[in-house]
A protein has these predicted regions:
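Short, surface-exposed beta-strand-loop junctions and turns on beta-sheet-rich folds
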Residues: 60, 225-226
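Binuclear metal-ion centers of metallo-dependent hydrolases, dominated by the metallo-beta-lactamase
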Residues: 149, 165, 226-312
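Binuclear metal-dependent hydrolase catalytic cores
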Residues: 1-219, 284-312
Length: 312
């Protein structure tokens, strides 16, 4: 499959609390500008004919409705925090529409947390109506995503739940043990899918992943990136990078740290995400960034992302 150019739609640019924050009366939280309304961080990527989601937090349902999306070929998880995984139950609608299990790509430690946090998904025999997930375990090595990576058709049986329909018409339960739901990601390459390049970072001490799709990279919830990872970020047109606030933070990049990284990586455009209400309203923030980048000679155009932004 020819990968071609990637197109990224920003579905959410907020912190774990979103913006506005419950009970806050600051200028940003009371702003009428839609660009100051921020769902939890997430992105939708169209790449090589595939529809790919990065992270499915508590706002997943509203984000899918806002962007008028009804099909996903893959869901990539950056890490195991609830603001990035808390909406995964809502893939049930996609299971029903597509008649396919949702293809979820995550690291082993994330999978272990999903098993604890969504026990009904992994319980056997399966509870009728539980989401259908097919897990691909990834690490920091490039991996392949293929369209309809599972060719098994889901059939809903009322009061019983989903079954797979075999080519001969026989119906079998979707999963009878964990091994039926989990496999290692495909690192073999080939021409019948798209290659995704993971970027290792750390969220304080927690290992997390960002992802590169062609000339677009999406990084969130990082406070450090190992030196050996920067080679994966060369030649970018667009970089999306988390920036939680002005002050140094133990698990997120501050604005000063982000501007240093934007200059070091040198993407044509750097978009800031995972933004808190401590930054000013959108228009003022844009002016502030323009001035700061000019003063520091940052070799990238740095702007705040906003929900609904499309970059390509």
């Amino acid at each position: 499959m020819k990968e071609g150019k990637a197109r990224l739609t920003v579905l959410g640019t907020g912190t774990s609390q979103g913006v506005p924050i419950i009970g806050c009366k600051c200028d940003v939280c009371r702003s009428k500008d839609s660009r100051d309304k921020r769902f939890r961080a997430s992105a939708y990527i169209e790449y090589g004919g595939l529809n790919i989601l990065v992270d499915a937090g508590p706002d997943f349902r509203m984000q899918m409705l806002a962007a008028d999306l009804c099909h996903l070929d893959a869901i990539l998880l950056t890490h195991n925090h609830k603001d990035h995984t808390g909406g995964l139950d809502d893939v049930r609608s996609l299971n029903y529409i597509d008649k396919r299990a949702s293809e979820i790509y995550c690291e082993q430690n994330v999978l272990e947390d999903l098993i604890r946090e969504y026990p009904y998904v992994f319980k056997f025999p399966k509870y009728p109506g539980a989401p259908e997930w097919h897990i691909h375990v990834i690490d920091d090595k490039p991996f392949m995503i293929r369209k309809d990576s599972s060719d098994k058709e889901l059939v809903w049986i009322h009061d019983v739940g989903y079954h797979y329909r075999l080519p001969n018409g026989t119906l079998i339960p979707t999963a009878r043990c964990l091994d039926d739901m989990i496999e290692n990601a495909d690192h073999t390459g080939g021409n019948d899918g798209v290659e995704v390049i993971p970027i290792r970072g750390y969220h304080d001490k927690l290992p997390v992943l960002g992802f590169r799709f062609g000339d677009i990279a999406y990084l969130t919830d990082m406070s450090s990136i190992p030196d050996e990872e920067f080679i994966k970020l060369k030649g970018l047109k667009h970089l999306t990078l988390n920036t939680v606030g002005y002050k140094t933070h133990h698990s997120h990049f501050s604005l000063d740290e982000t501007l240093v990284l934007a200059d070091k990586i040198g993407a044509e455009h750097t978009w800031l995400t995972h933004l808190s209400h401590t930054f000013p309203v959108h228009e003022q923030f844009c002016r502030n960034l323009e001035r700061m980048c000019a003063e520091r000679h940052v070799r990238s155009m740095v702007q705040p992302a906003y929900d609904g932004l499309v970059i390509e």
